[in-house]
Amino acid sequence: MVELFILMMERVGLIILLAFLLVNVPYFKRVLLSREKMSSKVQLILIFGLFAIISNFTGIEIAKNQIVPNNLLTYLSSNASIANTRTLVIGVSGLVGGPIVGSAVGLIAGFHRVIQGGGHSFFYVPASLIVGLIAGFLGSRMAKQTVFPSAGFSAIVGACMEMIQMIFIFFFSGDLSDGATLVRFIALPMILLNSVGTFIFMSILTTTLKQEEQAKAVQTHDVLELAAETLPYFREGLNKNSSKKVAEIIKHYTKVSAISMTNSHQILAHVGAGSDHHIPELEVITELSREVLRTGRMTIAHAKEEVGCSDPNCPLQAAIVIPLFSHQQIVGTLKMYFTDPAQLTHVEEQLAEGLGTIFSSQIELGEAEVQSKLLKEAEIKSLQAQVNPHFFFNAINTISALMRKDSEKARKLLLQLSKYFRGNLQGAVQTTIPVSQELEQVKAYLSLEQARFPNRYQVTFDVEEAVASEKVPPYAIQVLVENTIKHAFGSRKENNQVRVVVKAKQHKLHVDVYDNGQGIPEERRLLLGKTTVTSEKGTGTALENLSRRMANLYGSEGCFLIENLETGGSHVHLEIPMEQEELDARINR
């Protein structure tokens, strides 16, 4: 029995190899993490089925309670049996992939065991199928929660699955006396090692994925902080001063040896190793950078020769060069240099690609703000630009707070924020935008607020379908909704209702925002929208901002009204003249 135990431990190593492949090879990891998809289930069946067959081939032949030396078991005599890790593979496949994967792997392993031969081997098919189904149903409960079973729970399941196998061997291995003899010889090593093997497998799986998730959360948190710090500088445009500050910030947050930034023809900043000859204001000196400027694709150099620096003493041995875009045109590059090529890993590549996307958006935002200052409607543009940073920093704080609690939810909110700012890049150079676009921005804001305060606010929208293309000032509805959320309800944590109504009446677009809050003190209501109002929670600047923009755009034809409701709460009303072409379109509908 001791010899069998030692030999079985060697076979368990095969399962450890499988766990290593699943969490370290990118292809297998993608299949594992998308296991709810049918295509992934098929691939898991093939992977685990292959390892189950290998377990049969590498099993330990036993005849008359004696271990028969053999390297590869392709065929068994009629009086022989096998001690192997087949049940371990089947059980793990069910825990990871669910009942479909578990039962399919069980059938593959069972039929292959029958093909190998040996006395009374047909019972291995139903035994393997039952093991796969039970383990699969136990694992599917966890899959619905997007987590894997714990190692301890899996170890208990593994032991139970092997016990089921022993019961089948006892009753169906010919005479009961033969079955009992075989079970006494193999039961303890196989049950114990099946449990230990399952424990080790799931430990590797859960621990590695958890550590990776934590690392991603920390990295995303750092990237958000980095983006928040670089935003003010990119708003100045891509120039020597802003590039130097941005390069210093990036180097502080990353482990790179040097950071360099260029425009389309010259070096704007270089911080770190190689700064003695990578001098700002010189022309771009590396062939690598020139190639990226030509092609517009991220390029990676893993050797000094690929970097292409003309200085023979340059310490830079590897690099990632990312193109920076503005309005789909290449405006420069961001370069991350390494003095040791081993420092350039897949993590750095993903980080660089993400930073390139963020910085390109920030450059576009900065250019939009610069252009807005040159437009005739300078006052309107400057008022609009005041809203952007305010919302951005609120959103960053919300996502940062979620990062360590629910990184997946934070990722989705970050995508919402990205979509929001992509739309704002258009609104930043326009005096009006479609109602549909404005409502998308409002919903992006609300998704972030609901993340901070789940179920605190109930917001409903009553919007005529025909007004979706009508024009409103950027941020008009968002300012009203945001002001209501922040000030209407005080410390009340439930039954906070907001209703947004957008309809066309008498050649004008009517926007109404109602709430069931505590109302507005009369002396303050008379001042809101006309001047700043000192209070503990704000100054009323946003409403004054909107009122001034309405006046500049529409003059006496526009309307901005704030009132208290007799039933409690408040009501803010906007009237916006509809453009003549929009009126004609409505008449002809």
From Swiss-Prot:
Topology relative to the membrane: Multi-pass membrane protein
SUPFAM superfamilies the record matches: ATPase domain of HSP90 chaperone/DNA topoisomerase II/histidine kinase, GAF domain-like
Residues of the GAF domain: 238-363
Enzyme Commission numbers on file: 2.7.13.3
Residue span, Histidine kinase domain: 363-580
Principal cellular location given in the protein's record: membrane
GO cellular component: plasma membrane
Record keywords, A-Z: ATP-binding, Cell membrane, Kinase, Membrane, Nucleotide-binding, Phosphoprotein, Transferase, Transmembrane, Transmembrane helix, Two-component regulatory system
Compartments reported by the entry: Cell membrane
One Pfam family, short name: HATPase_c
Reactions it catalyzes: ATP + protein L-histidine = ADP + protein N-phospho-L-histidine
Segments passing through the bilayer: 4-23, 44-63, 89-111, 118-140, 150-172, 185-207
Gene Ontology BP terms: cell wall organization
Gene3D superfamilies referenced in this protein's UniProt entry, alphabetically: 3.30.450.40, Histidine kinase-like ATPase, C-terminal domain
InterPro entries attached to this UniProt entry: Bact_2-comp_sensor_kinase, GAF, GAF-like_dom_sf, HATPase_C_sf, Sig_transdc_His_kin_internal, Sig_transdc_His_kinase_LytS_TM
In-chain residues carrying the UniProt-annotated modification Phosphohistidine: H390
UniProt keyword Cell wall biogenesis/degradation present: no
Gene Ontology molecular functions: ATP binding; phosphorelay sensor kinase activity
Function: Member of the two-component regulatory system LytS/LytT that probably regulates genes involved in cell wall metabolism.
Protein name (Swiss-Prot/TrEMBL): Sensor protein LytS
Organism, as annotated: Enterococcus faecalis (strain ATCC 700802 / V583)
